[in-house]
Amino acid sequence: MKKLLSIIAISLLLAIELPAQTFSSLWAQVDKASKQDRPKTTLVALRQVESKAVKEKQYGHLIASLFSQILYQQQISADSVSNTIARIQTKATQLRKSDRIASLMFYVAMREMENSNGLKIDSLGLYNAYRGFGKKKEGKSLVAELLADKTIAAQLTRHDAVKDFTPLVLQREGSRYFNHDLISLIASTLDDYEPLIDYYLQSGNRKAACIASARMLGNSIDGYRGDKALVARADSLIALFADLQE
């Protein structure tokens, strides 16, 4: 009888729905396991984040979880990395139709991972899939196409848009000058600042236009060999933004 009562009691306890864990508590578990150098435990916690993010369509948490999983899988077994990459590519492709902004953030993360980790994730294939968002012209950059699409541009240039994708998107240096938008993040990932200059000038954000100009010029200076056109461009930019105090 006591055994039966124990079984019933346990069954009742299991039936009680426990409070759902928050993303903060799940990431705290990830952080704790990581600091204890327990990659397998860290992966378990990251998969819990992934599961919750999929259910709630919280793509910043989802992308951060998936790419973090790759880093820890590399410590345990490189063979498992390919499966996670496949899941990333599949999800990014699915989102192209249902949530293009989220899909773009997958692309940004893929490029970042390739740039920083040397991992091949075929971000080029995803990049090509985005061509033609706006009024496509021969040789037009992806950033220019995104800005040409009014619907997409409105979402990417919205103030504090990066908050929609925390903790994936961390506020970068100078992000406040771009009003923490997403288009500057994409441009930074692609090193494609030229389309931003006209956009920020037209929208009245001259500080952002100045920073975009400086970064574009900085990229051009790499390999500089005394190009007179480059010197002239630098002089014109100095004159254009000479009134800015910061």
Residue locations for each model-derived region?
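Bacterial N-terminal signal peptides
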Residues: 6-17
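Positively charged n-region of N-terminal signal peptides that target proteins for export
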Residues: 1-4
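Extracytoplasmic/secretory-pathway proteins
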Residues: 23-246
